[in-house]
């Protein structure tokens, strides 16, 4: 499970979690991109996440499950990713609801998603939160600040219009590529900006 790469140790495992916020397309596209790699992907989807995934994408549970190596029930606090001894390259919560953000910002590991996020932070691994809400209240902003101070990276899926995307898919791909880049994971979704 562990390999040496350019003088650093990497663990070929990552966690992807869907908290139930609108924007399930981001989580789905992230899983599709990770499926193209040799990484072991651990997936947690909350009950609200399943509802949004079905409603927003039309994807069935079976289709979603084929995109991950391991699916963990959001209630299973004894899962491997709930322990710091299970090493991962990091974790992406896509999309990240404001409820999940609040729980992560304040260390509330009340389900597997928030527990795994807490473990990721305490082990000093990268945690990327693709927060989805607009407009933002002062409470949301303070929770983003607290999560950032704890070590999380707030990465809202904001379209990069300077790239002149031709479709919604290209906008989604760019946001997912940014999240993968933040974990140092391979992605073939969007290239680097080269200027004009």
Question: Where are the regions a protein language model picked out?
Answer:
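A cross-family phosphate/adenosyl-ligand binding-site feature
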Residues: 8-196
